[in-house]
Amino acid sequence: IDFMLQSSLHCKVPNGAIDITSLFINLNASTDAPHFIMEFIQGSPTSMVVLLDLLPRKDLALHPEYIEKYYEDTEVDKQRKIIEQLPQARPYLSPSLFVRSAFSPTAVFFTIDCGKGGEGTLEEIVHGHLASVVKGILQIWLDTCASDASEMEEGEREIMVKRDRTVRSKSIEVDLTANLPRMFGPDVSGRIIAEIRKAFGVQEG
């Protein structure tokens, strides 16, 4: 493991509050195994956005064996289908084309909306189906990715490291730099982003 970043952000907005809980576990260059990403964005007591993925570190179209090893053989897509089958769930499409392109085909990207008066239903889903899916994907990552070591040529490793750095930097630009100032103001958001850049090992572009 290269580093782990856990964050919980709470922001009051005119019609309520937004809570964002994130967990990023990034692996180092001794392996090409996927990173682990989890993020929950709750904008109301009855709805939330769920993002879960084993974030690929290679171009999947160029490396079908990578898909087979980490996504097909592990049957991780079964976890996505559990959420997909919930009547309250609908696919979440990020407004960023970069974000959509960076994640795997098995990513759990859903909005769960339980409607008016659905606080209890959302809580049941979070503690039931969602908790089970999170545990399932994390266990797959721990079993298949966390302790994996990969033999790579030096040039291949350099490409992977560069890709990792680009994804980290672009993610900060697309997600945090664009949204945090509106939530917390320039001073607080600037300090948060600076610390995250430091953790991610990327410089301001």
Swiss-Prot record:
UniProt-listed Gene3D superfamilies: 3.40.1500.20
Chemical reaction(s) catalysed: primary fluorescent chlorophyll catabolite + 2 oxidized [2Fe-2S]-[ferredoxin] = red chlorophyll catabolite + 2 reduced [2Fe-2S]-[ferredoxin] + 3 H(+)
Compartment(s) of residence: Plastid, Chloroplast stroma
Protein residues bound to substrate: 39, 175
Molecular-function GO terms, alphabetical: red chlorophyll catabolite reductase activity
Pfam families: RCC_reductase (PF06405)
Entry keyword Oxidoreductase: yes
Domain of life: Eukaryota
Post-translational modification: The N-terminus is blocked.
GO terms for biological process, alphabetical: chlorophyll catabolic process
Primary location class: plastid
Pathway named in the protein's UniProt entry: Porphyrin-containing compound metabolism; chlorophyll degradation
Site (Important for substrate stereospecificity): 103
Expression by tissue: In etiolated and green primary leaves. Low amount in roots.
EC class: oxidoreductase
EC number(s) on file: 1.3.7.12
Cellular component aspect of the GO annotation: chloroplast stroma
Keyword field: Chlorophyll catabolism, Chloroplast, NADP, Oxidoreductase, Plastid
Known role: Catalyzes the key reaction of chlorophyll catabolism, porphyrin macrocycle cleavage of pheophorbide a (pheide a) to a primary fluorescent catabolite (pFCC). Works in a two-step reaction with pheophorbide a oxygenase (PaO) by reducing the C20/C1 double bond of the intermediate, RCC.
Subunit structure: Homodimer.
PANTHER family found in the cross-reference section: RED CHLOROPHYLL CATABOLITE REDUCTASE, CHLOROPLASTIC
Protein name: Red chlorophyll catabolite reductase
